[in-house]
């Protein structure tokens, strides 16, 4: 009798564990999809005068307690996460989004986790000696990254005029961070 109870308890714990793992996976997928819906809904937002301003841009900046006129790519990322109750640093400073605990991929590393939808990318600028542009990954391949990013333009500038869908080369990406875990 004791042996059958022991087997039953282990079987029950195994099933509960599978159920928990599956619900965690499903929950993350739902959150990623909601985040993606939010960032894609912003494609087409443009600055009012080309000076980091306009109703939507100022909303992104306010989320991070920044005034009109500040660069806003990181604020856009934080605002989107915030709209979906994803914990984030609420910062307009790109390096704040790439703390080691959140970084899952870095250029030239052998220990990378494959980036996925709703992760964020960072581009390093040697003249600034830091990551100075960020946005969302919508699709990742070995050679290309489909993105949605704020404060860019058709040419891919880090000081742009709106929210755009872009295709970047994977080799342009310096780091990837994951906030949906």
Tell where the protein language model's regions lie, with residue ranges:
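Bacterial N-terminal signal peptides that target proteins for export
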Residues: 1-9
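Hydrophobic h-region of N-terminal signal peptides that target proteins for export
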Residues: 13-21
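N-terminal capping segments
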Residues: 20-87, 180
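...with weaker cross-activation on analogous glycine-rich loops/strands in unrelated enzymes
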Residues: 30-37, 86-155
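Helix N-terminus capping/helix-initiation residues
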Residues: 53-54, 93, 169
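Short clusters of hydrophobic/aromatic residues that line enzyme substrate/ligand-binding pockets
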Residues: 57, 97, 163
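Active-site signature of cysteine proteases
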Residues: 143-181
